[in-house]
């Protein structure tokens, strides 16, 4: 029941609607400019790798802080903490993943060409975007639990996003350039 509450709450939330509309407009615009689904998937992947962790981290942290009083009220009932936490997490994850899948999936269905390779690339994009949403949402909930202060929690969420989106990639590229004389195919695939 708590997950359904979170889904209904986010269905009315303007930020959730803007998140879905953003992916609808960007995906439709990319299909309008490029006819091949594989090229659109590559372009969308770069947008998703940058934007989904940011939105999931910040939105998850803000939502957790804003729902803290509601969760305290629900915990006065005979409900376990695990049930409340999982309900809030699964509801928020379902809403964000659903918004992403609708935002990317509808233009892909309508405007995409459906050869096997291009279908696989769009499905991979949807899968990776969904996993990114779920992972960074879990990290944002952990951050909101660790930090009671909203400002510190948001700063930590932004710091985690900054590290994973920019610093980690920079360190991998620096390592690749430093050890360019050595065969790095396998370590680069792992990193």
Task: Locate each region found by the language model.
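Long, hydrophobic alpha-helical segments
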Residues: 43-67
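Aromatic- and glycine-rich beta-strand/loop motifs that create alpha-glucan
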Residues: 1-20
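Transmembrane helix-loop junction
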Residues: 9, 66, 76-77, 108-112, ...
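Secretory targeting signals
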Residues: 27-51, 91-157
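Helix-loop-helix units of permease transmembrane domains in multi-pass membrane transporters
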Residues: 62-97
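Central hydrophobic cores of alpha-helical transmembrane segments
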Residues: 20-24, 154-164
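A cytosolic-side transmembrane-helix exit/cap motif
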Residues: 63-68, 138-144, 172-181
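Terminal transmembrane helical anchor/hairpin motif
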Residues: 166-191
